[in-house]
Amino acid sequence: MDVRDWHFPLLQEVISSPEAAPEHLQPIAKRMFGAQAFILVTPEYNGTYTAALKNLFDYFPKQSHKAFGVVTASPGAMGGMRASQQLLLLVSGIFGVACPNMLIVPGVEKKFAPDGELIDLGYAKAVETFTREWLWLAERLQG
């Protein structure tokens, strides 16, 4: 799901169930409450993740015992490391469980095409490791 596809005003009230959501937000509320796990993908902006991502989880804050994968990217050498650290704080604050293995993508334009296709095949191992570890955590938390 792409947060940009949904037009959330800045937080007006926390949504505690799909039924409590305004009609136009009920489809995303059902997805958020029904999700068993999340992978958060964001570019780094000014040392943190996007405001749209923060606003989404402000609307739907309680994600107890759900696995979270963190993927950050930047054109620079650090690959969104500062944003990843901020996301770990967010995950903790909404009672999620962060996968210790994150996918940090430095020089993103050299690793992925604009359509998301992996173009640096040497980076495939990092993607595979992240995916395997996140799936392991998500499966364990679901029991």
Which ranges hold each PLM region?
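A glycine- and small-aliphatic-rich helix-loop capping segment at beta-alpha/alpha-beta transitions
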Residues: 55-63, 89-93
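Short glycine- and Lys/Arg-enriched binding-loop motifs that mark or flank ligand-binding interfaces
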Residues: 43, 72-76, 112
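N-terminal beta1-alpha1-beta2 submodule of the flavodoxin-like/Rossmannoid cofactor-binding fold
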Residues: 1-58, 117-143
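Mobile beta-alpha loop/short-helix "lid" or hinge segments that flank ligand
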Residues: 1-10, 61-63, 95-114
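Short, surface-exposed connector motifs at secondary-structure boundaries
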Residues: 37-38, 65-69
